[in-house]
């Protein structure tokens, strides 16, 4: 795949290029590229107009992070998250229970979070922490869904223990072969508001 005359490959596998700037290339690693939990070093080749740059990159099993409302992966800001209990997605503030349009029943609120770095990861190894409350197991309502290259969503249910928590950091954790990978620390994480 080529963008603006630039190609990029990891271990001979073409990468999807999202943007190319003067000093930065945003790319999506090839799906199913293998890695040990401590990371695997692969050769990376970047070409532009006949010039070739060869170096190395370390690939880890997962590198989860949460998109902010501007759809960038950066510290702080508001999380890109919606109430997906009903067909029409709604934004924060969130409540812990929502009335379903079909059936008019009060149910646990289902939130959809926009993420990156979790492709090929099952819901069984994912947990989401809001403030001090951890959501995992049956609280994770879906496996990750690919929305765009490098962008996935995952749905989860808000537990009653989050009622009235207010503005809280949201952290994504993935455990691969006994090793834990977290999106960010609390002080740099994106946030959401729960009434």
Per-region residue spans from a language model:
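A sequence-level detector for low-complexity, Ser/Thr- and acidic-rich stretches
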Residues: 1-195
């Amino acid at each position: 795949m080529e963008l603006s005359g630039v190609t990029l490959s990891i271990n001979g596998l073409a990468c999807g290029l999202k943007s190319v700037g003067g000093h930065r290339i945003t790319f999506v690693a090839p799906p199913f590229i293998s890695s040990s939990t401590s990371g695997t070093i692969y050769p990376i080749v970047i070409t532009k107009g006949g010039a070739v740059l060869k170096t190395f990159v370390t690939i880890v099993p997962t590198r989860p992070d949460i998109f902010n409302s501007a759809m960038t992966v950066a510290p702080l800001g508001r999380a890109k998250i919606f109430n997906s209990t009903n067909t029409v997605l709604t934004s924060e503030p969130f409540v812990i229970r929502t009335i379903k349009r079909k059936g008019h029943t009060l149910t646990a609120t289902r939130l959809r979070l926009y993420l990156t770095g979790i492709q090929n990861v099952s819901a069984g190894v994912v947990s989401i922490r809001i403030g001090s409350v951890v959501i995992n197991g049956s609280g994770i309502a879906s496996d990750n869904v690919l929305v765009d290259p490098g962008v996935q969503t995952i749905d989860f249910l808000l537990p009653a223990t989050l009622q009235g928590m207010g503005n809280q950091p949201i952290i994504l954790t993935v455990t691969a072969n006994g090793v834990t990978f977290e999106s960010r620390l609390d002080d740099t994480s994106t946030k959401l508001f729960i009434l």
